[in-house]
């Protein structure tokens, strides 16, 4: 049995009876330089404490290390020797970023290479968008639009920045805007199932914006990319994190085409469904909106793109990263250094290209 992305597994898995190391062999695969399990409102020690490295069976794990960078190894034969050397150097630099070898450990900062940054005079959000989504509104066939969008994304650390970027990019498309408001309700969490809308009016419920949930006012256009937020039909490729391109819109159903993966090109139908938010929401009620389980995907949060490759990559670092591995994950989505465009401020200690890089050496040293 192989378990991918083991760095996201909570240590509590060891409390189950699913793993018997005496009789079974379990392969755990993952890169511990990437982001770790999310602990709402948790601090460094809280996050480290829930990692699988703190499990009771970790002492029995035999560590094997991969040594060949497949992105470099699989580069097209048409690439010159100089391009291959550049790709190798970029891959080595990414490893150093992930290991925290390049940054100031006191301030958790690193200075990014000049050629990754937007040039002086172009350090604006519109220029970042233009560097990634140039010719966005050029007329294309559906297949061409899918090919264009699947290779592009702008990443940000915080969801509010992702929402702002998505809205700005969507308005660059000249096709008709369709707005789908959710029907929000709340239920008493005591278990009675009684509605609590009298205490929490719909205007307040509509204003709640929580990670992993669709927006109250979902704005979409035909030809825009979306990301699925729920597992609707994993066997058909409709999983949490699946990216699709909208082909048709109606009040209760979105028709969209899957962009990547083994189901790429498959036409799917996404219904408007009742959702529920209760566990760990820190709300005094259970939020139950009726909405399409999707968000725009021109821009995405860094934590959502682990495992994906992006050919034309933009990074919005005006708001710096805040957790272990986020900078490494963001930078390593690109295969080519020339395909990365980074927007950040030069206000940190007056140094050009300086940004935050959080690396938990306590975790890396255990693997």
What are these regions (language model features)?
Residues 1-367:
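RecA-like helicase/translocase P-loop NTPase motor core
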């Amino acid at each position: 049995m192989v378990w991918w992305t083991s760095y996201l597994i909570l240590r509590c898995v060891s409390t189950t009876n699913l793993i018997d190391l005496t009789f079974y062999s379990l392969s755990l695969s993952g890169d511990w330089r990437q982001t770790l399990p999310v602990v709402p409102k948790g601090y460094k020690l809280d996050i480290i404490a829930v990692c699988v490295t703190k499990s009771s069976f970790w002492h029995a794990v035999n560590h094997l290390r991969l040594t060949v960078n497949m992105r470099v190894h699989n580069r097209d034969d048409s690439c010159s020797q100089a391009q291959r050397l550049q790709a190798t150097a970029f891959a080595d630099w990414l490893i150093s970023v992930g290991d925290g070898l390049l940054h100031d450990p006191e301030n958790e900062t690193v200075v990014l290479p000049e050629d990754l940054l937007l040039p002086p005079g172009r350090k604006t959000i519109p220029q970042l968008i233009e560097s990634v989504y140039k010719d966005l509104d050029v007329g294309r066939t559906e297949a061409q639009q899918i090919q264009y969008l699947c290779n592009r994304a702008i990443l940000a650390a915080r969801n509010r920045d992702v929402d702002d970027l998505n809205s700005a990019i969507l308005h660059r498309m000249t096709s008709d805007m369709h707005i789908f408001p959710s029907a929000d309700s709340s239920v008493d969490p005591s278990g009675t199932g009684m509605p609590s809308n009298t205490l929490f009016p719909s205007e307040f419920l509509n204003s709640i914006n929580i990670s992993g949930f669709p927006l109250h006012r979902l704005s979409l256009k035909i030809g825009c990319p979306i990301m699925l937020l729920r597992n609707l039909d994993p066997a058909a490729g409709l999983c949490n994190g699946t990216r699709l391109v909208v082909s048709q819109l109606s009040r209760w159903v979105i028709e969209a085409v899957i962009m990547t993966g083994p189901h790429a090109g498959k036409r799917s139908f996404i219904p408007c469904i009742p959702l529920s938010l209760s566990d760990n929401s820190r709300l005094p009620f259970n939020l139950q909106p009726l909405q399409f389980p999707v968000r725009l995907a021109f821009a995405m949060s860094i934590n959502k793109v682990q495992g994906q490759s992006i050919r034309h990559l933009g990074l919005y670092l005006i708001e710096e990263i805040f957790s272990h591995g986020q900078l490494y994950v963001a930078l390593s989505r690109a295969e080519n250094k020339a395909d990365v465009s980074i927007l950040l401020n030069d206000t940190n200690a007056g140094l050009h290209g300086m940004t935050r890089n959080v690396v938990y050496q306590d975790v890396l040293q255990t693997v």
